[in-house]
């Protein structure tokens, strides 16, 4: 009887041990799963924070919807702009645009003539413009017969052939050199049947750039709303980023929230066929004839 009792007790102890082991392993597995989930969330949050900090402080992507900088920049070019180039202001910090964390700019660096800059226009603060910087604070800027004069000195301007747009429109192409040596191309609508485009902004009054503000022009001189027209002068505080290079470009846009899923799918093929491979990773400051 003692042996039977001993055997029964031993069997019971073994079962109890196995059950305890199973419970321990299950609890340990659940604990490991919880730890893994927590670690995954921490990693995800860290990645998001790093991505946001890169966008806010270092580099941001911008899509150009208009042709005011044609042919340097075309419609639907996607551009990377460096946020640190001129320091930081309320308007250069993504997601904090209108919170007004501080006044002016911190870590400010001086812009240079010829820089292509993304900024908020004073007359339309809910949007972004991209133009070329021409006039610095204290400068006198004037256009006479389409030629830029800075402080009464004519910049170098040499005709460099014809540019034909994707729509078939012809433009006269000019190589311009600013006083600091920066060179770029500007474009003017070519005559149609010998008739010149009505050039009411090729001759302007003199613009005296105030302290802390800047004068901008679009490279597409006949089709740009810039400092000659409604834009006026742009405060330094409104600068967002310095445009650097094109990372992607298409002739047509794909995404449109108004056309529905089926039409988006149907649009995918022509959109892919419209990719401008020759513009991908193009430096905006390289001169290509």
From Swiss-Prot:
The keyword Nucleotide-binding does not apply. Gene3D superfamilies: Umud Fragment, subunit A. It catalyses: Cleavage of hydrophobic, N-terminal signal or leader sequences from secreted and periplasmic proteins. Residues 1-43 are cytoplasmic. The active site is at 68, 131. GO terms for cellular component: plasma membrane. Keywords: Cell inner membrane, Cell membrane, Hydrolase, Membrane, Transmembrane, Transmembrane helix. Residues 65-289 are periplasmic. The chain crosses the membrane at residues 44-64. This is Signal peptidase I. Its EC number is 3.4.21.89. Belongs to the peptidase S26 family. It comes from Rickettsia bellii (strain OSU 85-389). GO terms for molecular function: serine-type endopeptidase activity. GO terms for biological process: signal peptide processing.
